[in-house]
Amino acid sequence: MKRVRVRRDHPYAPAWALVMLLVALTMYLVTEGVSAPGQQAALAPVEQVSWDIQPLSMSLVILSRAGDEATARIEAARYVARGAAGYVLPSSGEYLIAGAGYNSVDEAGRVMNKLGETEKLAASVATREAPEIAVRLTGKRAQADALIGAERALRDGTNALGEAAFRLDAGEIDLNGAREALLSVRAEAKKAREALEKASAGEPNQAAEEVAALLAAFEDASTTMLMGAGTSPLFFSSQMKYNYIDLRLRHIAFLSRLAGDG
């Protein structure tokens, strides 16, 4: 008698096979078809981006001059007590004591003339400027956009700082209003700096590093001013004018170096 072999069908075998097929397909998609976010950033195409940087200038109202730095700083302190910036600027063989900085020569000239009429002060005007620059950036689009945006944020934030100082002097805002303006521009500077650092991570760039450093200096200066307890409107205005001049001159120096490199 022939033996009859009975094959037992396993009811779960087809389902198990389907599960294994789905697992294999998923692994294929992960390893072959889908890139992680970091990989996507690394694979971003390199582009050439044109960056047209507008000229930047500052015209300083010079209240007095001194032959050495120590004398200049003593003289500057006298003007700080009156709400001026008291910024000491090295020049050819002397030190200039600046009372305030303005975006145009005409505006600085009007202030100079008014000081001569009302206070019999023999003031003068000194201008520092950087030319218009055409730069071609080579890199990822996100990096270029972050750098361009950061330079614009530095420019706009510094303008806002100077404007707040003059509005405080004119009585258009009070001390709290000036603090609020400073908080706002500090937040924008921080946002732009962090975006630039994130976009440039792992790929050092001299221009990006310098702009990030300037934005960090903006944040630090703003924080120092905001932490001043019991500050009077007059002294707060002096601090804002000082930092407005300092940040703008450092920005101009950066752009001048960039123009020289080009």
Explain the meaning of each model-derived region.
Residues 12-32:
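Hydrophobic membrane-insertion alpha-helices, especially the h-region
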